[in-house]
Amino acid sequence: KLKILGKHEEFTLYVAVAISNTLENAEEHLWELAKYVDGWGRIHLVERLSETNDPNIKHWMITEGYKNNIMYEYLALICAVTGDLKFELLKANPSPEIMQAAGEIIGALISGGPAEDINSYKDAGDVVKLYLEHSLGKDNSLNQFLILNSIKNYASNQETNWNELSSNGWTDDLRVN
């Protein structure tokens, strides 16, 4: 009955607390509930799943978890870190699903907003480089082109303190190319 109540966004946070405090295997229940909500409820649940080690939840975090009807920016960093986006992009041929999600996550991180942005992501430079390498020579969609353009605009911003961001993998070579 808690899950039924939790599917209503205005009650999701309270149900998440109740599930976390009373049910065994709470993580599985929170994940199941997160699939049914897409507003603030999803945001609250994904935040509570940020410490997961479950490979299925980690994959979901990258491919679906960041998506919400408020702002992708709220969950982009959590999902990139929890789902280990860098690891997924280190694979020789990431799936189209991973590439689309990676682009949307990178785009949200660059957009910034009220949540932590790309400057807070320790793997930012590596993830962007891998995304660019996988995108090279492909027939990119309009959405992918827009993401590539936002990467270019971000990397060419002269006002950014690139020395400070070098610890996040931003090299001069990456920014020039």
Residue ranges of each PLM-predicted region?
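Alpha-helical structural signal with a strong bias for long, charge-/Ser/Thr/Gly-rich
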Residues: K1, E24, P55-W60, M71, ...
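Structural detector for internal amphipathic alpha-helices that build alpha-solenoid repeat scaffolds
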Residues: K1, T12-E24, E32-L33, I43-T52, ...
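Eukaryotic alpha-helical scaffold "rod" segments
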Residues: K1-L2, K7-E10, D38, S156-E159, ...
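HEAT/HEAT-like alpha-solenoid repeats
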Residues: L2-K7, E28-K35, H59-I70
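Flexible loop/turn segments at the boundaries of HEAT repeats in alpha-solenoid HEAT proteins
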Residues: N25-W31, P55-M61, Y72-E73, P114-S120
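Short alpha-helical linear motifs
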Residues: A26-H29, W40-R42, K58, D84-F87
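Long terminal segments
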Residues: P55, N69-M71, F87-L89, N93
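Long internal repeat-built scaffold domains in very large eukaryotic proteins
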Residues: I78-N177
